[in-house]
Amino acid sequence: MAKLSHEELLSAFEEMTLLELSEFVKLFEEKFDVTAAAPAAVVAAAPAGGGGGEAAVEEEKDEFDVILESAGDKKIQVIKEVRGLTNLGLKDAKDLVDSAPKPVLEGVNKETAEKAKAALEGAGATVTLK
């Protein structure tokens, strides 16, 4: 197979639609057993309306810690999400999940914290923001 230059690859990507690129990324992840998870690619859930006074305090803060309280029933999925959020290796991510409650991310902005919380909760974890 002929080797493509970086310019040729970029040219090919420029001609693809977003759906085609998304499909390509999925195939690439499967082929090479990697993830291309970016914090911006995680869909955030709507914030909960409960806790009146506490919610007002959280909105004033500009840095948050994402605390993993427990992994729940889907420990493997939670480990995968932790790896995607932190770029930790498999062993380090597993150790973090096993030793919960532990901070997964520290000092991140509100949007990043909420996206991380939604991703971890989607994987079955119990998460708090501080």
Curated annotation (Swiss-Prot):
SUPFAM superfamilies: ClpS-like (SSF54736), Ribosomal protein L7/12, oligomerisation (N-terminal) domain (SSF48300)
Keywords noted in UniProt: Ribonucleoprotein, Ribosomal protein
InterPro entries according to UniProt: Ribosomal_bL12, Ribosomal_bL12_C, Ribosomal_bL12_C/ClpS-like, Ribosomal_bL12_oligo, Ribosomal_bL12_oligo_N_sf
Annotated Gene3D superfamilies: 3.30.1390.10, Single helix bin (1.20.5.710)
Record-level Gene Ontology MF annotations: mRNA binding; structural constituent of ribosome
Record-linked NCBIfam families: L12
Family to which the UniProt record says this protein belongs: Belongs to the bacterial ribosomal protein bL12 family.
Subunit structure: Homodimer. Part of the ribosomal stalk of the 50S ribosomal subunit. Forms a multimeric L10(L12)X complex, where L10 forms an elongated spine to which 2 to 4 L12 dimers bind in a sequential fashion. Binds GTP-bound translation factors.
The protein, known as: Large ribosomal subunit protein bL12
UniProt organism field: Thermobifida fusca (strain YX)
